[in-house]
Design a protein with these regions (language model features):
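An extracytoplasmic/periplasmic, membrane-proximal ligand-sensing/linker region
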Residues: 41, 51-52, 187, 211, ...
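Bilobed "Venus flytrap"/periplasmic-binding protein-like clamshell domains
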Residues: 40-77, 82-83, 257-329, 380, ...
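Short helices/loops that flank or line small-molecule/ion binding pockets
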Residues: 58-66, 80-134, 307-312, 319, ...
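Bacterial signal peptide processing site
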Residues: 25-28
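Ligand-binding "clamshell"
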Residues: 124, 129-132, 148-186, 211, ...
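Ser/Thr-rich, Proline-interspersed low-complexity disordered segments
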Residues: 32-36, 103, 112-116, 120, ...
């Protein structure tokens, strides 16, 4: 047992945590062990490079072990496409493992179509399904995931659905040795041109049907490519998860997300805020000095990235450093190498360093929610265990979990996970 673990365990028992422990006096009944869980084999949970994903993955793992599963944790880094493809990769398990699941296995054709339909991360090479180690659960952020699935918000859920249907039909036909006719070229009609961007994605997909579209689904998929983009800034976390559930590839399901309130925020130090009277993103354009920004790669491109500051606040960031590690971004901010950085609102570094969250009246920053995506054949007892954890991960619990597992003297992730499961806030 390490010295840091002992130190933080002593802290857990101190008077500083007395209010929390009192609030947690009432415990949920321990979940029942699933006697068939061991027959599933090793259940593998993938998590990204962010600290909160790592911490939550350990809580899910502890909960799954308590109901009888053997669990392995796998860091997937910053590659969303690789993580989701791992959920679709062949697991090597027998179709019937003895564990109860109400959802049937997808066909090989469906799995292939879903695998190939997923976008590839920028700069990443395409990976064959047999070259990916399979995963059973992946943790992601809802806003970022929806941007990924809709091509940075350019496609409506209706458009994505039609493309997935077309890909699945084409793959099934190819597996059966049938070649479908090519999709006819869609010429804009006067009504299409007149409607412009005023129609919904669903409406534009049916506004000008062709006689061939029912026979060849790729025609309707091609037509809905022109569907209106979605406005993620106007979406609640519930809207986002509903949209994600609708457009996830065949073979994947979305479980309940953590109930914590969380979003992307741009922050600065109190010194910079005072120096430039900067408390809101509106005030960025009034700062006459060049402000340095530290942002992750994912925020560097697209209409929902740093470009949104120009479109919504008439401010262009000219000195931008890309750093994917939030801890590195905080260090750059506090040593004044940069003056503004992007964090998640639950990041304990905001309070620890007394950082100023810049107000965002035009909603440039997206709502975010930690969500588990699963292989469709995940047994019901595993689904229930994950959903129970998500229901307890409100803002207070998630923030407290991150406080325990980060900073200069963090405790072990497994110890923090065990504490959160044994003492959830009520």
């Amino acid at each position: 047992m390490t010295h840091r673990t002992l130190t933080r365990r002593a802290l857990l028992g101190s008077a500083a945590l007395a209010p929390l422990l009192v609030a947690c006096a009432t415990h949920d009944a321990m979940p029942q062990v699933d006697p068939s869980a061991p027959t599933y084999g090793t259940l593998r949970i993938g998590y990204g490079a962010l600290r909160e994903m790592h911490a939550v993955a350990h809580v899910y793992a502890q909960a799954l072990r308590r109901v009888g599963y053997t669990v392995e944790l796998v860091e997937t880094g910053h590659s969303r496409s690789l993580a989701l493809r791992a959920l679709l990769a062949p697991s090597g398990r027998q179709e019937s493992t003895g564990t109860e699941s109400t959802t049937p296995e997808v066909s090989e054709a469906e799995a292939t179509a879903a695998y190939e339909a997923l976008p590839v991360d920028r700069g990443a090479a395409s990976v064959e399904a047999q070259d990916v180690d399979p995963l059973d659960i992946v943790i992601d952020y809802s806003g970022d995931l929806l941007l990924y699935l809709t091509d940075d918000g350019k496609l409506s859920p209706a458009a994505v659905q039609n493309e997935r249907v077309a890909a699945s039909v084409t793959a099934s036909a190819a597996a059966a040795g049938v070649t479908l006719p090519p999709a006819p070229t869609q010429s804009p009609t006067p009504s299409d041109t007149a409607s412009g961007s005023g129609e919904t994605g669903e409406a534009s997909g049916t506004a000008s049907p062709s006689a061939d579209s029912s026979a060849n689904p790729t025609a309707s998929a091609s037509a809905t490519r022109s569907a209106d983009p979605i406005n993620l800034r106007a979406m609640t976390t519930t809207d986002m998860t509903n949209a994600i559930s609708r457009i996830l590839p065949e073979g994947l399901n979305l479980l309940n997300g953590a109930s914590a309130t969380n979003k992307d925020v741009l922050v600065t130090t109190r010194a910079v805020s005072a120096r430039y009277k900067l408390t809101s993103l509106v005030g960025l354009r009034d700062v006459r000095s060049t402000l340095g920004f530290s942002i992750p790669d994912s925020y560097s491109v697209g209409t929902y990235g740093i470009e949104s500051l120009r479109s919504l606040y008439r401010f262009t960031a000219r000195a931008v450093t890309q750093q994917n590690d939030p801890a590195e971004r905080v260090r750059a901010l506090t040593d004044d190498s940069v003056q503004v950085t992007l964090l998640h609102s639950v990041n304990p570094a905001i309070d620890d360093n007394r950082l100023v969250v810049l107000e965002d009246p035009s909603s440039a920053m997206l709502q975010q929610q930690l969500v588990p995506i699963i292989r469709r054949t995940l047994p019901d007892s595993a689904r229930n265990a994950v959903n129970r954890v998500s229901s307890t991960l409100d803002t207070g619990n998630l923030s407290f979990l991150l406080q325990l597992t980060s900073g200069s003297n963090p405790i072990a992730d497994d110890d923090a996970a065990q504490f959160i499961l044994d003492h959830p806030r009520k």
